[in-house]
Design a protein with these regions (language model features):
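Active-site region of glycoside hydrolase catalytic domains
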Residues: 1-181
Length: 181
């Protein structure tokens, strides 16, 4: 995310269609699914019990529209949630790759097969992200200037951790572990 969209970390590139970002996320998703299958095959093949618990730790943000009364900000917020959280977590868990990580009608959206590919979810939550629509289609953060912030300037919102955990559990139905806060 940071390397392709914000250019903060390697590869520090951006292109119009986010091709590099999509491909890197798609490759990470496929690697997780393959590792999950392989680890479980090894455990079952050796008769080891209890079976391995293979999960994912994902960075979640509590996305909120900067201006809740503006349809454009609400849409940009929904889009940010889909791209950054919902679609990657569903692909990890179920193997279903939705756009932009999957390609409807042209390719198989279950490149590693459909199934249940995570046994738990690690939730790393650090901030609330207030989204403001940008006419060029970028996802732009507009923090609430009155909200408390961390040393990194990120908006602190303890209730956001609860909201993120509830949404994650509702969509995936997996045990949750707080892996970062």
């Amino acid at each position: 995310f940071h390397g392709y969209l914000e250019r903060n970390w390697p590869p520090a590139t951006r292109n119009r269609h986010l091709r590099g970002y999509r491909l890197s996320v798609r490759n990470m998703l496929r690697a997780h699914i393959r590792a999950h299958k392989h680890i479980h095959e090894i455990y079952r093949g050796k008769g080891w019990t209890p079976d391995a618990r293979v999960g994912i730790a994902l960075h979640f943000m509590d996305f909120a529209p900067s201006r809740p009364g503006k349809k454009r900000d609400r849409f940009a917020t929904w889009l940010a949630e889909q791209l950054f959280q919902d679609e990657p977590s569903m692909a990890h868990a179920r193997g279903h790759f939705l756009p932009p990580y999957g390609f409807p009608h042209r390719y198989n959206n279950f490149p590693e097969g459909s199934g249940d590919f995570t046994d738990f979810v690690g939730v790393s939550y650090y901030r609330r992200f207030r989204v403001r629509f940008h006419p060029r289609g970028r996802i732009v953060e507009r923090p609430d200037s009155s909200a408390p912030t961390s040393d990194l300037g990120w908006e602190i919102d303890a209730e956001g951790l609860r909201r993120v955990c509830e949404a994650c559990h509702e969509s995936l139905g997996k045990p949750l572990f707080i892996t970062g806060n």
